[in-house]
Curated annotation (Swiss-Prot):
Site (Cleavage) residue list: 319-320
Disulfide linkage: 44-155, 79-104, 235-296, 255-313
Modified residues (Pyrrolidone carboxylic acid): 20
Extracellular side: 20-370
SMART domains: ZP
Protein's name according to its UniProt entry: Zona pellucida-like domain-containing protein 1
Length: 413
């Protein structure tokens, strides 16, 4: 009888463990525990960052794969991982592209460190550190018996891996528009350029852009007919790639505009254009370089109705009319992002000679030392003058007497 009870107990335990891990490649002897730091593996690749999380302790803690998301973005399917059950143990994979770091709110911090440059010489090198976390959502209740899971990660790269000299990372947004012919989808993109010709995309050197460099931005739309134009509601900047970052600076918003920002075209065609001067965020005061991300809240409007949707400063009545017509003549808003724009402070070295000057020791004399050296120089000059004068006088005393020549006068005898 005891043997039968033992067999029943073992079977029930096996069934409970199997139900707990739901058929995933997990071992109850090793994975019946809460997650630990060793459960995450980070692979810092050239193009992507790959994160692997041991899924078995996550299941044991009472969560599923849909509960894990990057940087708290649980409502965004692009910020979740996917299960790989072909390995032991089963893992949840996250892939982060270096070209779209801002998509799920990963943080990018640029610092300067001493190391070998592209030529193998020891100099100051700019390093970009990418960091973030994977967590589970907070429960809607006041208390919870489930542990909150948190996995942190970071990767460091030379800056040339993150900011290519020929192009910048930019995001695109698909926006749905409904008209009399049905519903169509247009793609909005935000691009940065070197000059007002809007031909060559912005090129950022490894050392970063100098402050007050003028950058030209354009919001473009695809798959549009002539009846629709692009309308930029407002554009702003953040220190991170997160458009919802609390630390932000508005370039233009309604009738308010940054003095260094110029809007060339808005609501008049299928492209919005403006320019601004780059700056640094004060929070980066202890860093040689600062990161700036540009965000624009954009919509599509009918070409005939766009002027009514534009902010008309000083005329509240016209603005009220536009608000009433907005729902019928414009699409919803879309946020598009470009960056990072890397800026440098004025004391950031630009070339190898400046780097050498930074690395070489600087010799400074105090007031007493400089006065002593000046006195010695003056005394030496006076001694030299006295020596020359003495030689001149001595030569005059040693000169032979003058011998007169001519005929003798007998009158003096």
């Amino acid at each position: 009888m005891e043997q039968i009870c033992l067999i029943i107990l073992l079977i029930s335990k096996a069934l409970s463990v199997g139900a707990q891990f739901n058929g995933y490649n997990c071992d109850a002897n090793f994975h019946s525990r809460f997650p630990a730091e060793r459960d995450i593996s980070v692979y810092c690749g050239v193009q992507t960052i790959t994160l692997k999380i041991n899924f078995c302790p996550v299941l044991f803690s009472g969560y599923t794969d849909t509960d894990l998301a990057l940087n708290g973005r649980h409502g965004d399917a692009h910020c979740r991982g996917f299960i790989n059950n072909n390995t032991f143990p089963t893992v949840v994979l996250f892939s982060i592209s270096l070209a779209t770091l801002e998509t799920c709110g990963n943080a990018l911090v640029v610092s300067t460190a001493q190391g070998p440059n592209a030529y193998g010489n020891l100099s100051l090198v700019q390093i970009g550190n990418i960091s973030g976390y994977i967590d589970t959502p907070d429960p809607p209740t006041i208390i919870s018996y489930l542990p909150g899971l948190l996995y942190k990660f970071s990767c460091s790269y030379p800056l040339e891996y993150l900011v290519n000299n020929t192009q910048l990372a930019s995001s695109a947004a698909a926006i749905s528009v409904k008209d009399s012919n049905g519903t169509f989808v247009s793609t909005l993109s935000l691009l940065l350029y070197n000059d007002s010709s809007y031909v060559q995309q912005l090129s950022i050197p490894m050392a970063g852009l100098t402050l007050k460099t003028r950058v030209f931005a354009a919001v473009k739309a695809t798959n549009l007919d002539r009846r629709w134009n692009v309308l930029m509601d407002y554009c702003y900047t953040t220190a991170s790639g997160n458009p919802n970052d609390e630390l932000r600076y508005d370039l233009f918003f309604s009738c308010d505009k940054d003095p260094q920002t110029t809007v060339f075209e808005n609501g008049k065609s299928q492209m919005g254009r403006f320019a601004f001067e780059v700056f640094r965020f004060v929070k980066h005061k202890n860093q040689k370089m600062s990161t700036v991300f540009l965000h624009c809240v954009t919509k599509l409007c009918r070409a005939d109705d766009c002027p009514m949707l534009m902010p008309i400063c000083g005329s509240r009545k016209k603005r009220d009319v536009s608000e009433r017509t907005e729902s019928n003549s414009a699409s919803g808003n879309a946020i598009i992002t470009a960056g990072p724009i890397i800026t440098r402070s004025d004391d950031t070295p630009m070339n190898n000679s400046q780097l050498a000057q930074l690395n070489s020791p600087v010799f400074r004399m105090n007031t007493v030392t400089s006065a002593l050296i000046s006195g010695i120089i003056i005394l030496g000059v006076m001694s030299l003058c006295f020596f020359i004068l003495s030689l001149t006088l001595l030569k005059g005393k040693r000169a032979p007497p003058t011998i007169l020549s001519g005929a003798r006068n007998p009158a003096f005898n």
